[in-house]
Amino acid sequence: ESVTEQGEKIKLGFSCFALKIIFILNQLENYDLKNWTSYLNSYQNNIKGFPDNSFIDNNYLYYSRKFEVDKFTKDQIKKIINLSKIKSYETSQTKLANYIKAETKQAISTLYQIGEKPVKNYIDYPKNKYEINNYLESLNWNLPWNAGAQFASLCVFSSIEKEQNEDVNTLIEFSKKIVNSSDGLYYSGS
């Protein structure tokens, strides 16, 4: 049972999490993976404003887009500060786009973990050395949790491609640039 109404209705992330736990516990043979695969693939959508073939929980999308005065006000202030270039804040729309990318990564990696694939290929990610480096350099590595999540998404998306050698080497080379040799963590700044 969920603590909130929203949590009760959001299913994609929890379904991936449950299936990963079943995999870790080596209990896959006790479940109908064909139905589970179909269920996860049913979330693959083409919704305006998001990359084609993303995995999108429509309930999450509904609650994220629901108008709230405080969220709207914060976004407007963030946009003004961003324009002034004093500091850079993520708006609700950017957070939502990153969430959808993370859910897509999670669904694809879950399907591959159980030996299955998405119905349609997800292709909206950097694919060559220049695009990959440009994308990774655009991330805020002073906030490694978020940047690392985006890096992980790129690793998953790159791993499902047939021609992945350049991608993988570019990802490895970039990680070597941002690793801190004193603590072994991946970030920039202090």
Predicted stretch roles:
Residues S15-A18, T104:
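Residue-level detector of extended alpha-helical repeat arrays and alpha-solenoid scaffolds
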Residues I21, Q27-N30:
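Compositionally biased, flexible interaction segments
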Residues E29-G184:
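Extended ligand-binding groove/face enriched in aromatic
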Residues S2-E8, S92-L96, G189-S190:
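Short, recurring structural edge motifs at helix starts
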Residues K20-F23, Y112:
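Alpha-helical repeat scaffolds in large eukaryotic proteins
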Residues K11:
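Cysteine-nucleophile amide-bond enzymes
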